[in-house]
Structures are given as C-alpha cells and as structure tokens.
Amino acid sequence: MRVIRIAEVDIVPIDTATPIPGWTGGPVRRTRQPILPEGASKHFNSSIVNFEKGATTGWHVHKSDQILVITAGVGMVANENEEQEVTVGDVVHILEGETHWHGAKKESYMSHITITAAE
C-alpha cells in the first residue's frame, strides 16, 4: 500500500494544449501531476491534469477505456456526436477507441483525475 500526497507530486507542463472552438484569449496551457509514477502499477496509469481557461486535450483516442473524475472547475467533454459540461464530482467513462477531447471552458479552469490501463 502507498499513500500519495498530491501536494508533494511535481507539476509537469504538457507540451500541447488545444484551445476550445472560438477561443480568443491567447495561448492555452495544461499541466500534469503523475499520481502513479511510470511503472508503479502493472495495470493502471493515473494523473491529475490541470487545464487553464480555454485549454483542451484536442481530439485523441486511447487503447483502453478512460475514467475522468472532475476535481475542480468547470469543463467540457466531447466525442464525435456530442459535447457535455462537467463539474466537480462528475465522472466520465470514455470507451476504448472512442475519439474525444476534454478540457476547460473559456470562463473556468478545470482539473480531473485520469485513469487508463497501463500499456
């Protein structure tokens, strides 16, 4: 067993962030706090991802299901068919192979915990 104290986990910049459609607020940024260091689990990857106002992941897909637990702010999640607003306490289940994006709304930051299968 291991207790991870989030306040002690390094915040690492993520090189890419994509603005939400219609964003005019300049460059957008996001950061990651790896909850489980690489190789710490045979089965899971988990991080906290922090999005500044208007920042998203851009369209992407995973080789496994993904769980997002919204921990701060207000954001959006979208697949090719719909967009939905998410806020603190919401949990999102994204299927393996589902093209999607997630991030902050233009007027709010957003943070979530992400859980995927280790590859």
Regions found by a protein language model. Name each.
Residues 1-43:
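A short, N-terminal "cap"/entry segment at the start of jelly-roll beta-barrel domains
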Residues 45-62, 96:
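Conserved short histidine dyad/triad with adjacent acidic residue
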Residues 58-59, 77-78, 94, 99-106:
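Short beta-strand His + acidic residue motifs that chelate non-heme Fe in jelly-roll/DSBH
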Residues 64-76, 80-81:
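Glycine- and acidic-residue-biased ligand/ion/polar-headgroup-sensing regions
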Residues 67, 93, 107-119:
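A short hydrophobic beta-strand segment most commonly corresponding to one strand
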Residues 81-97:
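Short acidic-glycine-tyrosine-enriched beta hairpin
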